[in-house]
Amino acid sequence: MASGSGLCKTTSNFIWGQLLLLGEGIPDPGDIFNTGSSLFKQISDKMGLAIPGTNWIGQAAEAYLNQNIAQQLRAQVMGDLDKLTGNMISNQAKYVSDTRDVLRAMKKMIDGVYKVCKGLEKIPLLGHLWSWELAIPMSGIAMAVVGGALLYLTIMTLMNATNLRGILGRLIEMLTTLPKFPGLPGLPSLPDIIDGLWPPKLPDIPIPGLPDIPGLPDFKWPPTPGSPLFPDLPSFPGFPGFPEFPAIPGFPALPGLPSIPNLFPGLPGLGDLLPGVGDLGKLPTWTELAALPDFLGGFAGLPSLGFGNLLSFASLPTVGQVTATMGQLQQLVAAGGGPSQLASMGSQQAQLISSQAQQGGQQHATLVSDKKEDEEGVAEAERAPIDAGTAASQRGQEGTVL
């Protein structure tokens, strides 16, 4: 026999099942990403100290400087992306924890109502009626609160998933600026890696065929679309068939979503009878959700489920800094500091060093035969770097050519 206590028990079991789906234990706050963010910041600061001195001149030195600055910017981007990811995981952990607290409170409340209903059902005549009168509204309140909390968690999780796609897009954009040296073996591109991971490919398992038994219809796997054919079925002459119905007219082809045809033209619609009803089906936007008041904010002992943190990816903190850094990185790579130029500069400098070594050997033979002239002209033969001092400023600024 159905009773109010049975309704409370069913409601409590449903809430308990939802708690199981939310998991147990403390959610991961994402501290590992915060640690990675600080590590990338330290790497960026160390790379800023690796810039060559002012006495390094030449195209190779400029290409090296550009590559060093580009690597520093990449480290900054990775640190900012780790910080964004850590904040997102921390927020998601808070959303899950708050939703659990709400569901536990509702389960505790409905368990108390269950005990009261059990006591009322022992009263003869009106006991079951009083039990129903108490169980129905309390179970309805509990289910409404649980549904609102789960809807809140769904919306906030959807927002985090959308923002995570934005972070992944920035990461892929940064990986496309990595140097590709011609002498190194080819590495798989990022699209090839993604295609190999998703969608997952099932192993090709051969399915043995069925034995060929005379009289049985052919069996093919996988099945082909269409109705199966069963041969040698008896036919009944004169048996009436199904009547042929005329073609049902299709829905009118309108841009956007399809609409139901107007079966009764001229009659007023629901929107005409009740103004404002037509706007009920419109889904709220992110901005409208963020402006909603906090859910359960006025109940003591329950966490406040608010949509104030409902921000788009462009509105998140640190995203503007990531966008600016990515712009600098792309401009630096496009300005000529690319890896191909760095490799060509390296080959040119190798040839220059080889030619200078040959010239140095010839000059060494001349200096041995005429040591006195070499000592007299040593002051004129020396070349100081740019930061050598006053003598360098008098002869003109010359530096170490790379």
From Swiss-Prot:
<dbReference type="Pfam" id="PF18879">
    <property type="entry name" value="EspA_EspE"/>
</dbReference>
<dbReference type="GO" id="GO:0051701">
    <property type="term" value="P:biological process involved in interaction with host"/>
</dbReference>
<dbReference type="InterPro" id="IPR043796">
    <property type="entry name" value="ESX-1_EspA/EspE-like"/>
</dbReference>
<feature type="region of interest" description="Disordered">
    <location>
        <begin position="345"/>
        <end position="402"/>
    </location>
</feature>
<feature type="compositionally biased region" description="Basic and acidic residues">
    <location>
        <begin position="369"/>
        <end position="385"/>
    </location>
</feature>
<feature type="compositionally biased region" description="Polar residues">
    <location>
        <begin position="391"/>
        <end position="402"/>
    </location>
</feature>
<feature type="compositionally biased region" description="Low complexity">
    <location>
        <begin position="346"/>
        <end position="365"/>
    </location>
</feature>
<keyword id="KW-0812">Transmembrane</keyword>
<keyword id="KW-0997">Cell inner membrane</keyword>
<feature type="transmembrane region" description="Helical">
    <location>
        <begin position="136"/>
        <end position="156"/>
    </location>
</feature>
<protein>
    <recommendedName>
        <fullName>ESX-1 secretion-associated protein EspE</fullName>
    </recommendedName>
</protein>
<dbReference type="GO" id="GO:0005886">
    <property type="term" value="C:plasma membrane"/>
</dbReference>
<keyword id="KW-1003">Cell membrane</keyword>
<keyword id="KW-0472">Membrane</keyword>
<keyword id="KW-1133">Transmembrane helix</keyword>
